[in-house]
C-alpha cells in the first residue's frame, strides 16, 4: 500500500512540475525588448539559434550572407566579433536559456537610430561539451571553413569559447572567449575577449575587444550594482580606432517591490586616425540614464530616459573643428498581460541618428508601436505595428506578423512584413517548414518572396530567396549537413549576383 502511495505521489509531483514548466510564457514582452525562452518550447535538440529567430516578425532572414540585418549579436551583453552566420547556424537552442530581441533599447543599452541588439544568455552544462566542424562552400567561389566551440559549467565557473577560420581569396580568423566567475551568492565577474582578423587582397583588418563586468548584490530584495570596463581596437588599411569605455549601473526596488529603478552612467572616448593623412577625430560621450518600471499582476508600466552629452573634435590638414551637443533617447510603455499566453504592448520611443564624422546634424526618430504576442509550447504568434516620424525625412509604417507551429514530425514558421510610405509600398513573405524524419534525418526549406519595390529585390534582382537543408545525425557524435542556398539565382534573369551554391558540413561533438 505504501508503495502505491509513493508511486501516486511521485506521478502527481511530476505532473505538477511539467504543468508548471508548460505554463510559463515562451515569449515575454518588456518595454524595450522581446524575450524568448527556448527551454520552455518542445525541442528536438537540433534546432539552431537561426531557427528560433525566425519566430520574430522583424527578423526576416534576407539571404545567405545578410542573416540578421542591422542587429548586433551579443552574449551576456558583450558584442561578438565572430562569423555571425556560423554562430547562428551552429548554436543550438537547447544550449540557450534566453534570447533578448532588443529593438528599442535606446535607454537601457544606448543603441541609437535603427541599431538593435540580439543578446543571448547561455544555458551552461554541468561539464565540458562542444564540437569541431569542417565546412566547404561550393559555387562560383570555393571556401573552406573550420570551427570549434566549447561550453563548460561548474558551481563557480562558466566558460564559452568559439573559434573559426575561413579561407577564400584571403583568410578570416575569429576568436571569442567568455567566462563567468561566481565568488559567492552576491558577487560574480564576467570577463570577455574577442578578436577578428581579415586578410584580404585589398588589405588587412583587425578588431580586438576586451570587457569585464562585475556584479554585486546588496540584499535579498535584488539591489544590484554593475561596474563595466572595456577597450576596443580596430585597424584596417585606411583607419585605426581606439575606444576605452565604462559603465556604472544600479538596479533596485524602490519603496515597494512593485516599483523598480535602473540608474546608470556610461562613457566612452573614440579616437580615430586616418593612416597616411593628416586627419583625426576624437569623440567623447557621457550618458546618464534612468528607467522606472511599475508592475501589477496584469499590467506593467515603464518610462525611461537617457541623456547623452556629445563632444566632437576633428582635425583635417591642420584645421580643427569642434562640436558639442546634448541629445536624449526616451521610452514610455504599457504592457497588458491577461494570462501567461497573451500579451499586448503599447509604446512610444524617441531615438536619434548619431552624426558621422564631419556631419553634426541631429536626426530624431519618434516611433509608436502596438504589439501582441501569444505563446504556448507548440504554437506562438507575434504581431507588430509601428509608425515612424523621422525628422527632415519621410514618415513610414511597418507591419509584421509571424507564427510558429510544432508537431511531432514537423515544425512550421511563417510570416510577412509590410512597409508603407509615400515613396512606395513593398512587402515580403516567409515560409520555413522543417520535417523531422525517422533515422535522425531532418529536412528544412526556407522561402522568402519580395514584391517589386523591395530594397532587397532591387539590390539583388531576385524576387524569391530559397534554401534547402538536409541533416543526418549519426549516433550521438557525428552530424552531416548539406545546404543549397540562393536556389533561384540560376533561373532569375534579372539577378545581379549569381551565387547559387551549396554548403557541406561535418560536425563531431564531444
Predicted regions and their residues:
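Short strand-turn segments of transmembrane beta-barrel domains in outer membranes
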Residues: 42, 126-150, 163
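Surface-exposed extracellular loop regions of Gram-negative outer-membrane beta-barrel proteins
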Residues: 124-127, 159, 174-188, 192-196, ...
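Extracytoplasmic beta-strand/coil segments of soluble accessory domains associated
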Residues: 24-28, 50-81, 109
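Transmembrane beta-strands of outer-membrane beta-barrel pores
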Residues: 135-140, 154, 165-169, 193-199, ...
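N-terminal periplasmic accessory domains that precede
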Residues: 49-52, 86, 111-134, 146
Amino acid at each position: 500500500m505504501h508503495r502505491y502511495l509513493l508511486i501516486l505521489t511521485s506521478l502527481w509531483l511530476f505532473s505538477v512540475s511539467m504543468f508548471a514548466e508548460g505554463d510559463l510564457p515562451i515569449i515575454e514582452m518588456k518595454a524595450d525588448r522581446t524575450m524568448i525562452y527556448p527551454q520552455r518550447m518542445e525541442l528536438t535538440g537540433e534546432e539552431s539559434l537561426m531557427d528560433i529567430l525566425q519566430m520574430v516578425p522583424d527578423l526576416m532572414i534576407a539571404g545567405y550572407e545578410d542573416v540578421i540585418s542591422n542587429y548586433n549579436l551579443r552574449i551576456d551583453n558583450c558584442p561578438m566579433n565572430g562569423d555571425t552566420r556560423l554562430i547562428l547556424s551552429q548554436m543550438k537552442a537547447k544550449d540557450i536559456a534566453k534570447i533578448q530581441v532588443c529593438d528599442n533599447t535606446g535607454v537601457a543599452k544606448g543603441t541609437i537610430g535603427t541599431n538593435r541588439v540580439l543578446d543571448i544568455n547561455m544555458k551552461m552544462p554541468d561539464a565540458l561539451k562542444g564540437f569541431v566542424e569542417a565546412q566547404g562552400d561550393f559555387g562560383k567561389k570555393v571556401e573552406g571553413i573550420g570551427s570549434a566551440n566549447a561550453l563548460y559549467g561548474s558551481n563557480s565557473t562558466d566558460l564559452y569559447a568559439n573559434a573559426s577560420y575561413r579561407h577564400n581569396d584571403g583568410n578570416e580568423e575569429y576568436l571569442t572567449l567568455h567566462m563567468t566567475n561566481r565568488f559567492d551568492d552576491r558577487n560574480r565577474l564576467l570577463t570577455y575577449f574577442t578578436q577578428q582578423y581579415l586578410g584580404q587582397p585589398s588589405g588587412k583588418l583587425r578588431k580586438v575587444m576586451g570587457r569585464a563586468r562585475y556584479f554585486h548584490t546588496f540584499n535579498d530584495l535584488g539591489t544590484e550594482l554593475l561596474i563595466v570596463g572595456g577597450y576596443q581596437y580596430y585597424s584596417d588599411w585606411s583607419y585605426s580606432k581606439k575606444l576605452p569605455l565604462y559603465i556604472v549601473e544600479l538596479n533596485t526596488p524602490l519603496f515597494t517591490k512593485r516599483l523598480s529603478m535602473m540608474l546608470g552612467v556610461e562613457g566612452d572616448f573614440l579616437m580615430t586616425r586616418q593612416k597616411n593623412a593628416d586627419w583625426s577625430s576624437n569623440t567623447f560621450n557621457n550618458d546618464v540614464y534612468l528607467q522606472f518600471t511599475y508592475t501589477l499582476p496584469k499590467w506593467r508600466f515603464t518610462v525611461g530616459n537617457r541623456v547623452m552629452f556629445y563632444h566632437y573634435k576633428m582635425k583635417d590638414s591642420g584645421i580643427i573643428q569642434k562640436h558639442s551637443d546634448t541629445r536624449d533617447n526616451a521610452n514610455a510603455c504599457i504592457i497588458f498581460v491577461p494570462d501567461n499566453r497573451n500579451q499586448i504592448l503599447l509604446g512610444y520611443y524617441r531615438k536619434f541618428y548619431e552624426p558621422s564624422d564631419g556631419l553634426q546634424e541631429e536626426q530624431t526618430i519618434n516611433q509608436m508601436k502596438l504589439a501582441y504576442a501569444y505563446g504556448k509550447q507548440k504554437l506562438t504568434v507575434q504581431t507588430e505595428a509601428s509608425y515612424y516620424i523621422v525628422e527632415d525625412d519621410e514618415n513610414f509604417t511597418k507591419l509584421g506578423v509571424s507564427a510558429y507551429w510544432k508537431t511531432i514530425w514537423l515544425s512550421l514558421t511563417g510570416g510577412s512584413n509590410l512597409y508603407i510610405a509615400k515613396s512606395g509600398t513593398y512587402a515580403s513573405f516567409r515560409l520555413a517548414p522543417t520535417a523531422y524524419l525517422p533515422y535522425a534525418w531532418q529536412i528544412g526549406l526556407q522561402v522568402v518572396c519580395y514584391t517589386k519595390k523591395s530594397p532587397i529585390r532591387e539590390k539583388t534582382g531576385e524576387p524569391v530567396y530559397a534554401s534547402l537543408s538536409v541533416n543526418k545525425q549519426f549516433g550521438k557524435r557525428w552530424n552531416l549537413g548539406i545546404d543549397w542556398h540562393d536556389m533561384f539565382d540560376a533561373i532569375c534573369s534579372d539577378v545581379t549576383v549569381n551565387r547559387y551554391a551549396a554548403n557541406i558540413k561535418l560536425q563531431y561533438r564531444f
